[in-house]
Amino acid sequence: MNPNHPTPGQIPQLRQLWKAAFGDTDAFLDTFFDTAFDTKRCLCITADDEIAAAAYWFSCGDYAYIYAVATAAHHRGKGLCHTVMAAIHGLLQKQGYAGCIVVPGEESLRRFYGRMGYRDFGGIRQFTCAAAAPVLLRRLEAAEFAALRRTYLPANSVVQEGENLAFLSKWAEFYAGDDFLLTVTREGEQCWVPELLGNPDAAPGITAALDVKTATFRTPGNAPFAMYKSLGVKKPPTYFGFAFD
């Protein structure tokens, strides 16, 4: 069972595997497959005329972010995930990528990727705060956000534009203030800020300006988050922001 790029006709099977593995909605999958998916950035294994394992990646300049790695439940324990990942590593290296990135969803996966040569880098801080005196926010279009984000990122950070930004902009809002930049997603009364760059002390005022009682923020920090595997450049990046989680 060798990994191959999927055909367009296999997209329904890819979606079925994804939903079974991660529980995402059809709306989320519609957004991904409409804005971020390319058969050339996916490898899968077919067994008994069904997709048994698959993984995707986003191009992030010198790096590739490997995303949504999944194996069908009845095919687990056969090493298919490892086979797909190894094939992706080889392909990305041939394509000239400096390294690849994953964001494990749990500690067992962090150990699994560690055995494949991945190491923690950068880090995040995540916290929830209540609203305080509001600050001024300015709504941004995606292109302006991307340009401004480059000025806020730490040196040697992973730049996530192209299909990354196209995907993100379908379900997120972008704002800037005097000394900060943020991305916001909302679901009912829940407000999630998957990235706040700049002044983290502005978070309570941002929460008020977003007209919610509380909000959860993710900023650069020290807690384990992304992992890096070198494909030629040993030194990892300093920061990775959007896991699309």
Name what the model sees in each region.
Residues 190-245:
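Charged, low-complexity intrinsically disordered regulatory/assembly segments
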Residues 92-105, 212-221:
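Conserved GNAT acetyl-CoA-binding A-motif
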Residues 44, 50-58, 63-70, 101, ...:
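Conserved beta-strand in the GNAT
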Residues 82, 97-98, 105-123, 222-233:
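Conserved active-site alpha-helix within GNAT-family acetyltransferase domains
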Residues 116-200:
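Amide-forming acyltransferase catalytic core, primarily the GNAT-like/NAT-type
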Residues 1-14, 135-147:
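A short beta-loop-alpha structural element at the N-terminal edge
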